[in-house]
């Protein structure tokens, strides 16, 4: 079986609205917290995991608003606090309150010194917090209590986020990525900022400045591994987004797939279209909702699937190298804890890999802080006995003890802190101080590994990120256990709204009509 190397969804973007530099530059504050969190993961996310940036550090994060850029010159940007954590388990209540309280405090300081025109909220949209539903709405609501109803708010999100009616109400503009894998991250955020500036300019010119918002929820909740925009039907669905956006009277159009590994009532697919023409945004939203719903039974996994054993058997028989296998159930970039040892345990039990002359396999990765410390002390080439994994998630397999040679040591990684490689027969197992995603070729080559000449590469990931996708000569998605198990039904969701596809297979067609959400300075009424 070979990979169907379809290009990423082509972005058909209309020119962004023009903006002007006014005598007094408008003031826009930047804030946000982002963490994609699985409620089925045993791990917990604490405040340091967000790597918070404050003040000028916030502005430095985004090249398109820095001094010298068009937006940087047109706006007086003020940084409050942003924090982007690696996906993981539920955010602790203390972490959320610590960070959100600091955001509120910084907003108070900023609003005391200058009048705000706008706020850009940069979030993911799938953050779950202990004891709190709809955390992003709660965050924005508290921000609104400080900045007031007159400040215009633009929100940028991941398409795997969730948009409740309440969150949509608190915003004036809301958009999300249009590609998965996400190759339009910066573009999306810049669009959110440019459109916000356009609203501010319209207000200063005496024009209507609060757009209408058409919101349609859909009873669909699918994983990213079935909704990649590389493949159909997502490719043509997301191509339609830009066509709707190009319609007269429309500012922005967006489809959120939603986040499948969290058990909250808000979790589902959503369409939002914003603009000046109520009829245009309503019909545009309904067009997107209809095309999405009509295709809901057509979504399939982005690669051939199988059990871990089946994937290994097929990879060994294949002549295509390197052959990639996604150990999908513990994917740390989807919310898995990252320290499930089930896959590595299964791999090392195979006789094909016990000898160093066997097929070369790279496995990425399992955290093992103690093993890392031992390797660092012993040095490259030393033989050590070390135990790794299952410190957080031991439900599927216990800690794994190995006596093997240290192949490589690397210090200073942003996510992992320290990485080591242990050679176990013909398997090169990457062990980390802290969990880390492996998305780039250099993630391997910097560890003295040669992925392009390896036989099999097993990565805790779902769909392959672009560099890995282009490197792979073949690929399978192993349906393995963990906090982001691709078998959604066996996870046991209890709080999502029902019926919901694919949890329920037969139900009446949902209401696909647009709901016009009240403007942010109006009271939210109705259902």
Positions of predicted regions on the chain:
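Glycine-rich anion/phosphate-binding loops
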Residues: 90-104
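Internal, active-site/partner-interface "lid" segment
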Residues: 200-235
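Extended hydrophobic packing segments that form well-structured cores
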Residues: 79, 97, 101, 293, ...
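Glycine-rich phosphate/diphosphate-binding loops that line cofactor/substrate pockets in enzymes
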Residues: 15, 21-25, 107-117, 311-323, ...
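Short acidic, glycine/serine/threonine-rich loops at helix termini
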Residues: 40-44, 91, 131-133, 164-169, ...
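N-terminal amphipathic/basic leader segments beginning at the initiator methionine
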Residues: 8-9, 13-71
């Amino acid at each position: 079986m070979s990979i169907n190397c379809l290009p990423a969804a082509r972005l058909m973007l209309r020119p962004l609205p023009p903006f002007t530099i006014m005598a007094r530059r408008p003031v826009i504050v930047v804030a946000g917290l982002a963490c994609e969190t699985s409620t089925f993961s045993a791990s917990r996310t604490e405040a340091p995991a967000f790597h918070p940036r404050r003040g000028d550090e916030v502005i430095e994060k985004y090249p398109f608003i820095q001094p010298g850029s068009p937006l940087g010159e047109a706006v007086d940007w003020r940084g409050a606090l942003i924090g982007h954590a690696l996906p993981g388990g539920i955010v602790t209540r203390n972490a959320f309150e610590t960070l959100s309280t600091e955001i509120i405090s910084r907003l108070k300081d900023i609003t005391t010194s200058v009048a705000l025109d706008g706020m850009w909220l940069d979030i993911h949209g799938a953050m779950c917090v202990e004891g709190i539903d709809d955390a992003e709405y709660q965050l924005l609501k508290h921000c609104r209590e400080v900045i007031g109803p007159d400040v215009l708010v633009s929100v940028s999100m991941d398409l795997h986020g969730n948009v409740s009616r309440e969150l949509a109400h608190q915003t004036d503009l809301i958009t999300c990525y249009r590609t998965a894998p996400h190759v339009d991250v910066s573009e999306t955020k810049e669009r959110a900022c440019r459109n916000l500036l356009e609203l501010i300019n319209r207000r200063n010119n005496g024009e209507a400045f609060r757009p209408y918002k058409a919101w349609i929820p859909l009873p669909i909740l699918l994983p990213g591994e079935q909704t990649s925009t590389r493949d159909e039907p997502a490719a043509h669905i997301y191509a339609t987004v830009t066509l709707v956006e190009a319609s007269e009277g429309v500012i922005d159009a967006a489809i959120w797939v939603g986040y499948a590994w969290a058990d909250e009532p808000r979790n589902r697919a959503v369409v939002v279209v914003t603009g000046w023409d109520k009829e245009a945004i309503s019909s545009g939203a309904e067009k997107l909702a209809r095309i999405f719903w009509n295709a809901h039974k057509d979504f399939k996994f982005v690669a051939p699937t199988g059990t871990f054993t089946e994937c290994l058997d097929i990879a060994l028989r294949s002549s295509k190298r390197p052959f990639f296998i996604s150990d999908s159930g513990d994917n740390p970039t989807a919310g898995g804890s990252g320290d499930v040892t089930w896959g590595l345990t299964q791999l090392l039990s195979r006789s094909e890999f016990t000898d160093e002359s066997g097929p070369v396999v790279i496995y990425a990765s399992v955290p093992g802080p103690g093993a890392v410390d031992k390797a660092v002390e012993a040095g490259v080439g030393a033989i050590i006995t070390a135990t790794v994994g299952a410190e957080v998630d031991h439900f599927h397999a216990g800690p794994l003890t190995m006596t093997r040679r240290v192949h490589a040591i690397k210090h200073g990684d942003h996510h992992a802190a320290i990485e080591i490689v242990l050679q176990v027969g013909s398997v090169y197992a990457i062990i980390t101080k802290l969990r880390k995603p492996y998305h780039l070729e250099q993630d391997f080559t910097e560890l003295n590994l040669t992925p392009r000449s390896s036989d099999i590469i097993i990565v805790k990931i779902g769909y392959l990120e672009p560099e890995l996708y282009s490197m792979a000569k073949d690929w399978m998605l192993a349906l393995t256990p963990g906090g982001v198990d691709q078998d959604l039904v066996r996870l046991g969701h209890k709080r999502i709204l029902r019926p919901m596809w694919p949890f329920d297979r037969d139900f009446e067609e949902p209401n696909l009509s647009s709901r016009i959400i009240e403007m942010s300075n109006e009271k939210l009424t109705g259902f």
